[in-house]
Every structure is written in structure tokens, then in C-alpha cells.
Swiss-Prot record:
(2R)-2-phosphoglycerate binds at residues 167, 343, 372-373, 394. Its EC number is 4.2.1.11. PROSITE patterns: ENOLASE. It is found in: Cytoplasm; Secreted; Cell surface. NCBIfam families: eno. This is Enolase. One of its GO terms (molecular function) is magnesium ion binding. The active site is at residues 209, 343. Component of the RNA degradosome, a multiprotein complex involved in RNA processing and mRNA degradation. The gene is eno. Its cofactor is Mg(2+). GO terms for cellular component: cell surface; extracellular region; phosphopyruvate hydratase complex. Mg(2+) binds at residues 246, 291, 318. Catalyzes the reversible conversion of 2-phosphoglycerate (2-PG) into phosphoenolpyruvate (PEP). It is essential for the degradation of carbohydrates via glycolysis.
Length: 433
């Protein structure tokens, strides 16, 4: 009953108004899985390729008809008749057929959409929720946990049209006892932040990931207004709510000069100086996680950052590792960072994503499941976080349906699993157990 009978691709629209790939996989017995590929704005140079048409007369060159053609043509031809339950074989067929190092022939957007749709169809054929099927694929059947959310409530960098250089300022509702309570706490802080910003005369328009995107005097001020909002919501900063940042430092690194140029603050830093700048913020605020604190190619700087901060806080590699086991293995060997951000469109298939999570966990690194800035209503990452018991999730703020869809799916899953999926809070964050 799990034999593939049809594979279908279509062009749909993401949360930024750009096209993306949606795929359907149909099985014998009428089971169907449907999934859509997300899309990033601040992308690592070593990510798998997102195939775009380049026809400027259509969607400003961002159409995905070539990727759709691959889904409806070569990929469909290769997968019809195959067993959807064998996810590793399905993904291997597509990767081999593509034949490139970075999935540039079919596009990671095409391969991923089919990969995820296949997993959903297989789960349906087994009569189980996706998270349960993912746990089985992961070799951890029946082992679940609810992830601690990192909620991006102030957006800067490539995710907003403002003067804030650091891309994401996040809160983690660590005082919550359940995922549902964590979502409530996040929403309360978010609404109080709106009031704090308005009281200071700041704009409360939101960025790509649903966080506010005001022009601020400094990056430290972003943390200060969040601290005010946490207090106004009736919570204790550092006890009930902790802070996290995604610097996305590759976006303000001047490669030629070898400096970090924070135009919003009018400051420049060497790697070492920027590491000490971050260490200063960690001293001043209860920041427990920093992502991409340096440029993706600045491995010497990352080694210094890990020595300086790695035993105190979680240091997450996103552009640094791009969900790629080859790059992660090198990072583990060299003692670079202590956590990996997991974005399945960076690598382009579910099987390879699960391999990256396993490699990280086996090495004592944490794995943070993440959305992209260009999202859809697809909430697969919620099931991925629970099904791998990854422990942490980044899926934006408390506004925009493309973000909230993931929180709502997590609430549903928690309700279904009850005590089988504990919410471990701060214990999930590297260095905070």
C-alpha cells in the first residue's frame, strides 16, 4: 500500500511573495503527502542550490518552473513504483539522478519538496502522524520531546528594512512547563514589546519572521527593550525568559578588508574584537545562545570564539555548517562551535537532514531545528523537531501565519503525545543543563 503511483509539482507563493515548489506524492490506497520548500534570505555560500528560472519577465527572475519540470518529469519517472516507506532509497534516487554536488540540476527546492511529501505520504500509509514516522526513520521510535522555542521578536539584518545589523534577537521562555505555556509566555512578551516600542516612539511594523523591525540606537538597545518587555509581562529575565541572538555576521563582514562593519552603529571590528564585543553582551544580558557570531569562512575566529564563550553558552553554526555533514564533521574535529542549526533546504533531503542531526548529537553538539525567512503554511519542521527530540526550534515570532502555523502544530502534537513528549526547557540548550 506504500507504492508511489504519482508525483506532482506546482509553483506556489511563499511568505515574501516569491514562488516556491510544492510537491505531492500519491500512493496506492489513496494516501497523499504534500509539502513545500522554504527559502532563505541570508544564505550560506555552501548551501545546496535553490533553482530559480532567471526569467526577469516573470516573478523578477524568481520563478521555479525549471524545478517544477524536474519534479513532474525526471523525478516522477524515477520514483513511480518505488516504496515510499524506504525514505533513504527515495532520497538516494533523486540525489543520484541529479548527479551534482549541490543539487544544482534539479534544485534542492525540487528534491526537498518531494522528499518531505514522500515522508508525509508514507506516514499516512502507516496510519501514523508524521512525527512518529520521522522518529522511526531516525532510529529513535517512540522517543519524543517538545522543543524549546527561540522566538525572534526583533528582526534586523537581511530580515528587515532597518538599521539594526544583528539579524535576530530572540527570547526563550525557559520558565514554562509545557510548549503551550512557552507559546503563551512568548505572545505576552511580544505584545508588551509592542507597547514598549510605541512608548519610545519606535515603529512596530514587522519583518520577514514576524518580529518588530524598528530603527534603534544600537544592538544593545534591542536587548534593553526586550528586557523591558519581559518585565512588563511579569516575568524575570534570566529566570523565566532567556535571550538568544543570530548575528548572521557573514552579512556585515567585509571580506576584502577582513573586518566586521556594523553600519547601524558606525563601528568596525576585527574577529577578535567582535568576539569580545559579543562576550560583553553576554556579561550584560542573560544571552544563552549566539548563532553565526562570525563570517562562515572565519574558522580561526570561530575557534577563538569557542574558546572564549563555548563553555558558557551555546554557539550555533548556521551559515557555518549549512546542515552539511561533511562541513559539520570538520567543525567537530576542530572544536568549532557546539551546536548546529538545522535547515533542511540547506542540504535538500530529509535523509541528509536526519544524518546531520545524528552526527551533531553523537558529538555532544545540540541541534536547533529552523524555519527560513521565506516560509509557507507547511509545518513539517514542527514534526521534525518532535520526531528527532532535537530539543530546540527557531520558527519566528508571534505574528504572521507562516510562523504561527508551526507553533500551532506543536501545540497539537503536545496535546496528542501528553507526557510521552516532555518539555525540558533550558536543559536543552548547550552549556545550560
Amino acid at each position: 500500500m506504500s507504492k508511489i503511483v504519482k508525483v506532482l509539482g506546482r509553483e506556489i507563493i511563499d511568505s515574501r511573495g516569491n514562488p516556491t515548489v510544492e510537491a505531492e506524492v500519491h500512493l496506492e490506497g489513496g494516501f497523499v503527502g504534500m509539502a513545500a520548500a522554504p527559502s532563505g534570505a541570508s544564505t550560506g555560500s555552501r548551501e545546496a542550490l535553490e533553482l530559480r528560472d532567471g526569467d526577469k519577465a516573470r516573478f523578477l527572475g524568481k520563478g521555479v518552473l525549471k524545478a517544477i519540470e524536474a519534479v513532474n518529469g525526471a523525478i516522477a519517472d524515477a520514483l513511480v513504483g518505488k516504496d515510499a516507506k524506504d525514505q533513504a532509497a527515495i532520497d538516494a534516487i533523486m540525489i543520484e539522478l541529479d548527479g551534482t554536488e549541490n543539487k544544482s540540476k534539479f534544485g534542492a527546492n525540487a528534491i526537498l519538496a518531494v522528499s518531505l511529501a514522500n515522508a508525509k505520504a508514507a506516514a499516512a500509509s502507516k496510519g501514523m502522524p508524521l512525527y512518529e514516522h520521522i522518529a522511526e526513520l531516525n532510529g529513535t521510535a517512540g522517543q519524543f520531546s517538545m522543543p524549546l522555542p527561540m522566538m525572534n521578536i526583533i528582526n534586523g539584518g537581511e530580515h528587515a528594512d532597518n538599521n539594526v545589523d544583528i539579524q535576530e534577537f530572540m527570547i526563550q521562555p525557559v520558565g514554562a512547563k509545557t510548549l503551550k505555556e512557552a507559546v503563551r509566555m512568548g505572545a505576552e512578551v511580544f505584545h508588551n514589546l509592542a507597547k514598549v516600542l510605541k512608548s519610545k516612539g519606535y515603529n512596530t511594523a514587522v519583518g520577514d519572521e514576524g518580529g518588530f523591525a524598528p530603527n534603534l540606537k544600537s544592538n544593545a538597545e534591542a536587548l534593553e527593550v526586550i528586557a523591558e518587555a519581559v518585565a512588563a509581562a511579569g516575568y524575570v529575565l534570566g529566570k523565566d525568559v532567556t535571550l538568544a541572538m543570530d548575528c548572521a555576521a557573514s552579512e556585515f563582514f567585509d571580506k576584502e578588508a577582513g573586518i566586521y562593519n556594523m553600519k547601524g552603529e558606525g563601528k568596525t571590528f576585527t574577529s577578535e574584537e567582535f568576539n569580545h564585543y559579543l562576550a560583553g553582551l553576554v556579561e550584560q544580558f542573560p544571552i544563552v545562545s549566539i548563532e553565526d557570531g562570525l563570517d562562515e569562512s572565519d574558522w580561526a575566529g570561530f575557534a577563538h570564539q569557542t574558546q572564549l564563550l563555548g563553555d558558557k553558552i551555546q554557539l550555533v553554526g548556521d551559515d557555518l555548517f549549512v546542515t552539511n555533514t561533511k562541513i559539520l564533521a570538520e567543525g567537530i574535529e576542530k572544536g568549532i562551535a557546539n551546536s548546529i542549526l538545522i535547515k533542511f533546504n540547506q542540504i535538500g533531503s530529509l535523509t541528509e537532514t536526519l544524518a546531520a542531526i545524528k552526527m551533531a548529537k553523537d558529538a555532544g553538539y545540540t541541534a536547533v531545528i529552523s524555519h527560513r525567512s521565506g516560509e509557507t503554511e507547511d509545518a513539517t519542521i514542527a514534526d521534525l523537531a518532535v520526531g528527532t527530540a532535537a530539543g530546540q526550534i527557531k520558527t519566528g515570532s508571534m505574528s504572521r501565519s507562516d510562523r504561527v502555523a508551526k507553533y500551532n502544530q506543536l501545540i497539537r502534537i503536545e496535546e496528542a503525545l501528553g507526557e510521552r513528549a516532555p518539555f525540558n526547557g533550558l536543559k536543552e540548550v548547550k552549556g545550560q543543563a
